[in-house]
Amino acid sequence: MVYIARIRKKVKKLIKSIKPVSIIIMGNDFENVEDLKNLIRWIFSIYTKDLKIDPPIVAIDQEGVNVSRIRDINYIPSNYALGKIDKKNISYYAGALTGYELNEIGIRWNLAPVLDTLSNKENFSILERSFSEYVDNVSRNGSSFIMGLQDFGVSATAKHFPGIGSVFEDPHEKLPRDLRNIHSIWNTMKPFIDAINIGVKSIMVSHVLVKEIDQDFPISLSQKSYNLIRKELGYDGILITDSLDMKAISTNYSPNEIAKLAFLGRADILECVDPELAEDIHENMKNINLNNSKREERLIKLYLERKKKFIPPKEIIQIISYNVPKWIRRKEFNPDRDFYIYYAGSTAYMNNIIKRIILKLRELNFSVKEFNENESLNNSQIIIIGKNLHLNGNYIKINEMCKNNECIFINTGIPYDSELLNKKIGYLAAMGDKYENIISSIYSILGLFYHDNF
């Protein structure tokens, strides 16, 4: 599996060289849904017209919240929000809507959902991507999401086996080590076992060295881990590695070692979003016997028939997004006074959301301004939007900013940081960075909408 960059000429050369069985689309590969559809048609034409072979299965990471590659279709606020709602029919609906939307575009494989149990609140790479801190919650909501996705003709992926919610290190940066005992590992493996039992079509193996499974190699390169999945768990679907360009792998193993360990270990698909590394790995695979009829059978099974003919109503996801925020420290602003909005982050996506929100509020005749942190304010009303203050340290600046002002913090992630803020600062957990989550939170702050306490 390779990642498509925007430079089409180089991409075409790469595809012709590697002939990947699957191509993963990333968020910066397209401008909008129509551009994405054209991209998929262009990819298919290379296979069918130039190479005269079957087209690849197109995959994407459409988990919801911050891992939503397609931002202009309906997507869930976050897995964590679904876990807090904790209704199987709602999680099924979220998967069904995602499956319907992806299938309409031509994407038949979603590298979701995350089935990691959030055991460590400092696990920056997982956080709100997880359904819950509790294994059973992850199992029932994850399985429901999978069933919804697959009922609408899109194969799901249970990731990141055997569960990486307890580690501290981010595999994008270094190799994490899971030193837990075997009982704890099997406990957080339960969501994956339940996913196998309901027929999940693929499992993504993680780049974590799990001491009790293999002391020498990370799960993605470990024959012991593949034997565990195939023989002990009896799984016969697709096994795909997490992206091999992550530093957990790419800085510790050569392309030759990656090719041999992963493929001889019996991974079906090697994911790599770095085109140069993908070519290097492919070159080193030429001397490996890749004949595996089982792999071909598993690939074919990724193409699912859509079982459900109805269209999941889109307004339900909007209702969920409007209603999911919860108060931790309830506080309201006077809507007749001026107020400011400050974004304590840096993503272009969120900056655009804030601009959209300010325009909407001004349409409603609210006196609202975007806060400039160089301004010196006193006795002003400030709405602050951000997340994960316990990891980025922004709580220090926010506490200082709010000494002489009335402030309410809207957290778009998981509210692990509420105790770090001064108690006089109001706190509302939006549990998602969607427009609907944030605008409804602001309406609640202005006394126009009601959210329950957390």
Predicted features, each with a name:
Residues 1-19, 252-454:
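Preference for extracellular/luminal or secreted protein segments
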Residues 2, 7-10, 30-52, 67-68, ...:
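Second-shell residues forming the walls of enzyme active-site clefts
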Residues 3-6, 58-68, 108-118, 158-164, ...:
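Short glycine-enriched loops at secondary-structure junctions
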Residues 13-26, 96-109:
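Catalytic domains of carbohydrate-active enzymes, especially glycoside hydrolases
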Residues 21, 108-109, 201-202, 268, ...:
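Short acidic/polar active-site loop segments enriched in Thr and Asp
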Residues 25, 112, 205, 272, ...:
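Conserved beta-strand positions
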Residues 34-45, 87-106:
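Active-site-adjacent structural elements in enzyme catalytic domains
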Residues 74-87, 130-132:
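A charged helix-plus-loop insertion that forms the helical arch/lid used to bind
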